UniProtKB/Swiss-Prot annotation:
Interaction with target base in tRNA as annotated region, ranges: 95-97
Protein name listed in UniProt: tRNA-specific 2-thiouridylase MnmA
EC top class, as a word: transferase
EC numbers: 2.8.1.13
Region (Interaction with tRNA): 146-148, 303-304
Family assignment from sequence similarity: Belongs to the MnmA/TRMU family.
Function: Catalyzes the 2-thiolation of uridine at the wobble position (U34) of tRNA, leading to the formation of s(2)U34.
CDD domains found in the cross-reference section: MnmA_TRMU-like
Pfam families with a match to the protein in the record: tRNA_Me_trans, tRNA_Me_trans_C, tRNA_Me_trans_M
Protein source organism: Chlamydia abortus (strain DSM 27085 / S26/3) (Chlamydophila abortus)
Amino acid sequence: MNKTVVVAMSGGVDSSVVAYLLKKYTSYRVLGIFMKNWEEEDSNGLCSTAKDYEDVERVAEQLDIPYYTVSFAREYRERVFSRFLKEYSQGYTPNPDVLCNREIKFDLLQKKVVELGGDFLATGHYCRLDVKSQRVGLLRGKDPHKDQSYFLCGTHPESLKNVLFPLGDMTKREVRSIAAQAGLATAQKRDSTGICFIGKRPFKSFLEQFVPNVEGEIIDYDSQKIVGNHEGAHYYTIGQRRGLDIGGSEKPCYVVGKDMEKNIVYIVRGEDHPLLYQQELTAKELNWFVSPESITRCSAKVRYRSPDEECEILHTGTQDTVRVRFTSPVKAITPGQTIAFYDGERCLGGGIIEVAMTPHSV
């Protein structure tokens, strides 16, 4: 009897092509499943869930595959969104996509796949798996512009044992071409960007619905003078330049620190200001695809679009945290963001940035 693969279909071109490739070129029995993580009424209809589901229906019917829908809205709110709000209110800048992969897609959705009689879960992620050894390995996707291993660095290896990433060896251009040649209904659909529960709204207007505004001061760190006011330090992230509304300087202003107790935002002037650069950080909530004791030197990404930075991992004697020392100073390391570790194309693991060390305290 042929094995069954359940495709996580988002209504986008990537997951549509995954379903198409598995249906056309494999002997698997292919099912589609649409995962709803956010109640549309909570986002004033801006999360496009209904339109996305319509696109899933159209593609599934084109391919003649059964399709299902499942709602994890309550679990998403409890396990992802509530933490997102808590961390923002504490001054961190969390990445909900990394948490969603760990808590929802490769946990709850995996369990749903089993309920449906599935042997595998397939998604449209641009990354690859190494299943040759007992421990599943995570590799970068072939397309460096679309590689999504960063977003999976926090997902436990055991959760990826029965997962397929058919797009891992493909570029986005190739995927678009396949979708067009196959006449898929989503072939011309634009890629989704940003956080789904925010939709098209400005981030601040969304967040202020859940975290109250508290007016405070913006202070120039060097002069210690008040240079502006804000409606809440939680709205600002380290390295932020836009939205400060501070004049009187030829050099651009950047957020360099926040005092959450006093509700103060500190800025510096000039993109080369030394306080914008850090050479060491502490990471927590670690997840490894290899034995951590075997890692001394590697490279790391401190945010999705950042370049790889050469670093040394200093083990602290506990399994909960590590110190990371970079070969060269790195700009705007942001507590709350995910750090992913690499050795070439192999993702070694990841964690959450707890604190970045600067030569001076901010």
